[in-house]
């Protein structure tokens, strides 16, 4: 049961944008892809189709490398990062900590493509039949020279070997200086030993307060 819970922790803390406090095992590859669909009428910001592609690979037991590709602002901004995630302290402790550094680019029709730097800090804690996690980061660009913060807070519960649920609050500062907040409940189905399907909803708490359903596929090799 402990290994099942740890596997779920690793999977969910990896989604949507940051490697979490739990390191990927050495040699393990994780890939997640998905997006939103069935948008509510008028939904544009902060909830849109928002397709994502995310991958992690365990270089060592303490270094996880990955890529993070996504769109934002009604699909008008495309961002891609390569990152390294490094845990701090005891890898078997109940409370886990990690730092994350990333280098990337942002493309938009409003200005030339710019280089980005991102720094992050994560905390996670295993609890009975589940976990808590907080992932924070700040991004700065060579053109947009403002540090823009982001925070995702997640509560997850492992019901059995097949089903897991999560509730995530996503907050941050957008590219146009708007402050956004979204909440996302999700059900995760362990379809095969190396494949999980996550389906849920996203509800904007700011902006036009639009909503959507979301679907993601997670693969582990």
Protein language model annotation of sequence segments:
Residues 1-26:
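Cleavable N-terminal export/targeting peptides
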Residues 18-150, 154-221:
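Transmembrane beta-barrel domains of Gram-negative outer membranes and organellar outer membranes
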């Amino acid at each position: 049961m402990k290994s099942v819970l740890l596997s779920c922790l690793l999977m969910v803390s990896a989604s949507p944008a940051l490697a979490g406090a739990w390191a990927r095992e050495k040699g393990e590859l994780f890939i997640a892809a998905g997006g939103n669909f069935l948008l509510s009428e008028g939904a544009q910001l902060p909830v849109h189709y928002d397709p994502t592609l995310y991958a992690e690979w365990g270089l060592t037991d303490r270094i996880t490398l990955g890529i993070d590709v996504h769109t934002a602002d009604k699909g008008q901004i495309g961002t891609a990062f390569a990152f390294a995630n490094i845990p701090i302290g005891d890898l078997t402790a109940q409370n886990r900590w990690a730092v994350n550094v990333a280098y990337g680019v942002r493309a938009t029709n409003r200005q030339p493509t710019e280089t980005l730097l991102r720094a992050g800090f994560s905390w996670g804690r295993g609890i009975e039949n589940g976990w808590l996690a907080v992932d924070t980061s700040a991004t700065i660009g060579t053109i947009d020279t403002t540090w823009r913060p982001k925070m995702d807070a997640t509560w997850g519960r492992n019901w059995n070997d097949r089903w897991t649920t999560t509730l995530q609050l996503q907050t941050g500062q957008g590219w146009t200086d708007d402050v956004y907040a979204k909440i996302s409940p999700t059900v995760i189905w362990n379809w095969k030993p190396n494949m999980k399907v996550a389906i849920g909803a996203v509800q904007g708490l700011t902006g036009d307060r639009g909503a959507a359903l979301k679907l993601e596929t997670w693969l582990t090799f």
